């Protein structure tokens, strides 16, 4: 992330995705949520995400953060309830509908799997 305080421009790279479902394949989702909170602390005129459109609207950051938070917390609850990955995928359709204008629907399916696998207890043999 690069922040230009004089110009109030924030180059976020893959930390922000506007108009796309975030690709969290290699991300630490709780950390990504914390980073979004940190980004919101900066006075920013323009956000330049790694994917999507340039924006001056901080609500874009909030929307992405809230999406990741909802996804992460929902999957965590389902893992604690002992749900399978297939049962956990039930959350995808409502989230896709809520963010109907976003592209990259395949990233939502991938995110569900990545987060689910990261929360499952490790079994030692």
Give the location of each predicted region.
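Accessory terminal helices/loops
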Residues: 41-42, 55-125
């Amino acid at each position: 992330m690069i922040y230009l305080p004089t110009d109030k421009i924030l180059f976020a790279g893959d930390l922000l995705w506007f108009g796309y479902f975030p690709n969290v394949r290699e991300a630490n989702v709780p950390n990504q949520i914390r980073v979004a909170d940190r980004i919101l602390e900066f006075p920013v005129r323009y956000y330049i995400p790694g994917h999507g459109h340039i924006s001056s609207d901080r609500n874009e950051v909030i929307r992405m953060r809230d999406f990741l938070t909802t996804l992460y917390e929902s999957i965590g609850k389902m893992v604690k309830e002992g749900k399978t990955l297939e049962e956990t995928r039930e959350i995808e359709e409502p989230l896709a509908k809520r963010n109907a204008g976003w592209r990259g629907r395949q990233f939502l399916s991938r995110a569900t799997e990545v987060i689910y696998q990261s929360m499952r207890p490790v079994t030692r043999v």
